[in-house]
Curated annotation (Swiss-Prot):
Gene symbol of the encoding locus: ribK
Protein name in UniProt: Riboflavin kinase
Family: Belongs to the archaeal riboflavin kinase family.
Keyword annotations of the record: Flavoprotein, FMN, Kinase, Magnesium, Metal-binding, Nucleotide-binding, Transferase
Cofactor binding remark: Binds 1 Mg(2+) ion per subunit.
Cited InterPro entries: RibK_CTP-dep (IPR039063), Riboflavin_kinase_archaeal (IPR023470), Riboflavin_kinase_CTP-dep (IPR023602), Riboflavin_kinase_dom_sf (IPR023465), WH-like_DNA-bd_sf (IPR036388), WH_DNA-bd_sf (IPR036390)
């Protein structure tokens, strides 16, 4: 869990523009905004960098700080908590799309034992070695943008046999009563209209799905 003071500092850096790219930021200026000493501000920057929430670089005119993807995710998780507090009636989202054929990457990655163990540990089911690929309709593409604030689970990467495997994010969901999860590999950039879904069974066979069939994905939170 992120310490409250680190989260406060991270939020301040983001408000100053750190999510858009490196910004000039001295320890003294950060301390002035937060109402703390430059020494304390420096320690917080070091702590954020250690957690890989920010990057720091020195240039002739001073220090530049940028919020990383991990830092953005920490802020989005905090935002998701506030959504649950102030908008309790928003219990979930529904994505609608059509089934499409994938390129086989999902089958490969889901067949790697360490991936299967990690996904099984955080989702409560051992994933079938393959994914269901869905192309979203226009309305669901817009809905998908809100999912950045949903309850994603980070799955860390690992190294095996001198090869590095990237991490991923998974979002628990339901398809016609089957427990599933949307999976987004950290090293892959998918079009905004496409999602990959994993489950404990072969969804195509279990639900008798073919390419171009319409399907709904339900994402809920407590």
């Amino acid at each position: 869990m992120v310490e409250a003071e680190d989260l406060q500092s991270l939020k301040t850096i983001a408000l100053l523009g750190g999510c858009r790219g490196p910004i000039w930021l001295s320890s003294q200026s950060l301390g002035s905004v937060l109402g703390i000493s430059p020494q304390t501000a420096s320690r917080r920057l070091i702590a954020l960098e250690r957690q890989q929430f920010v990057t720091r670089s020195m240039k002739p005119d001073g220090q530049y700080v940028a919020v990383t993807r991990e830092g953005e995710q920490a802020l989005k998780r905090e935002y998701a908590d506030y959504v649950r507090i102030f908008n309790p009636d928003q219990r979930g989202y529904t994505l609608t799309g059509t089934v499409i054929s994938g390129l086989g990457e999902g089958r490969y990655y889901m067949s790697i034992p360490h991936y299967k163990e990690q996904f099984g540990g955080c989702l409560g089911f051992e994933p079938f070695p393959g994914t269901l690929n869905i192309r979203l309709d226009a309305a669901s593409i817009a809905v998908r943008k809100h999912l950045d604030h949903a309850g994603w689970i980070d799955v860390p990467g690992f190294t095996a046999d001198d090869r590095t495997f990237g991490g991923a994010r998974v979002l628990p969901c339901l398809i016609r009563g089957y427990r599933c999860a949307i999976v987004v590999p950290s090293r892959t950039h998918y079009p905004e209209d496409t999602i990959e879904v994993i489950a404990g069974c072969e969804l195509r066979k279990a639900l008798n799905l073919n390419d171009n069939d319409t399907i709904e994905v339900e994402i809920t939170h407590d």
